[in-house]
Swiss-Prot record:
The keyword Glycoprotein applies. SUPFAM superfamilies: MFS general substrate transporter (SSF103473). The chain crosses the membrane at residues 37-57, 109-129, 136-156, 166-186, 198-218, 226-246, 268-288, 307-327, 338-358, 364-384, 401-421, 429-449. Residues 485-511 are annotated as: Disordered. GO terms for molecular function: acetylcholine transmembrane transporter activity. It holds the Pfam family MFS_1. The keyword Transmembrane helix applies. One of its GO terms (cellular component) is AP-2 adaptor complex. It comes from Torpedo marmorata (Marbled electric ray). This is Vesicular acetylcholine transporter. Keywords: Glycoprotein, Membrane, Neurotransmitter transport, Transmembrane, Transmembrane helix, Transport. Belongs to the major facilitator superfamily. Vesicular transporter family.
Amino acid sequence: MAVGQAKAAMGKISSAIGERSKRISGAMNEPRRKRKILLVIVCIAMLLDNMLYMVIVPIIPNYLETIRTYKLVYITTPSNGTNGSLLNSTQRAVLERNPNANEDIQIGVLFASKAILQLLSNPFTGTFIDRVGYDIPLLIGLTIMFFSTITFAFGESYAILFAARSLQGLGSAFADTSGIAMIADKYTEESERTQALGIALAFISFGSLVAPPFGGVLYQFAGKWVPFLVLSFVCLLDGILLLMVVTPFASRTRVNTLQGTPIYKLMIDPYIAVVAGALTTCNIPLAFLEPTISNWMKKTMNASEWQMGITWLPAFFPHILGVYITVKLAAKYPNYQWLYGAVGLVIIGASSCTIPACRNFEELIIPLCALCFGIALVDTALLPTLAFLVDIRYVSVYGSVYAIADISYSVAYALGPIMAGQIVHDLGFVQLNLGMGLVNILYAPGLLFLRNVCQMKPSLSERNILLEEGPKGLYDTIIMEERKEAKEPHGTSSGNHSVHAVLSDQEGYSE
């Protein structure tokens, strides 16, 4: 009797849980709600990637000093015989400071390894994303980042830390590119797309700026492995949430997917090249200042450890303000995205030039805040422009174009940790900042080249020029039919029939 009641109760609970799961699944698969959840997943992935990138800033220098700057040497101690001769000798091992361990070079290479591998991987990951979609690469990226973070937590040698850092670069090439491309794909209306990309940029900024104090506090009070385990746990949860929303390895119902434009064609597009150059240029000051500003603060203003630790934290708020202002302006005046980017470059240039003039911590906060405000203007204005350019000039598949954007960022962050210290040593901190500021100001007029982009419409003549090969898929076949239709004097009905015939043929072929 009791067993039967227990079974009945378990059956009711199981059916209730199943019904609840169906409701949750149905609610999550509602199109507008689903894209919001996907935006949250992408933002968490961006947050994790940038936190992992910056969390090692207060941890690695101190940790490397303990594991790399000492070497094991053996000292031979002679023992005298009774007649004064050396009969025996004993050896003992001691730790001696290693004069050949160049910590600055080691740290610079470790920091740059992530961006270098990301830079090398992006051409391939962009093409892969164009072929398979956005969800599988995002899941691959989160998986690689999870294992990279775990390796960081328990790695105890420079070689293992270097491998973990490089592995993170590969994960970022998948996760960052597919995440941004997914946002561009889900949010097709320009104002919504700009807003969604702005939210993602806010999470990127928050991750970069909050990670150093987060890592420093946990490292000091809980040990090296704790901050990395926290990040790996969040990464695991983000991957599980992604699997709940999408089914990346389920059988694909869409047989005829659009074929993305090869990345080499996008790279030689003059408009995309101008945008990519602006993204690299605006991030150079940040990438070159991060490894050099702490030493300069210590020498110039005798800054304390906590001041050097929170140098970039106040800049988070003007960065968010810059994102918000650009989103609002883009919604009201969408034709001036190029102008917002140009203003941002000028602000970055002026801020970079004024940093060496600061003589105390309070003064330094002002140009750093202005610098991040300008970066927010450039990024928020130009990232949606890349998707718009692909929409009007190519096929609306965004993996390769955002791989180019990721390459632009990676160039700056690959060169910064390696070159910045040497430039400061050879030329000086003042000359470094003046050079970076001048480059940004001189690049700003180049964005005038983009002033007519928003008036562009997809045109058959432009497609004729850009599409050099014959039709390879449904989209290009229809485009070819439309071209023929445009050439015929009374081709409206026949053109429509031809397109329908193409659709019928494609459907019959897929069956």
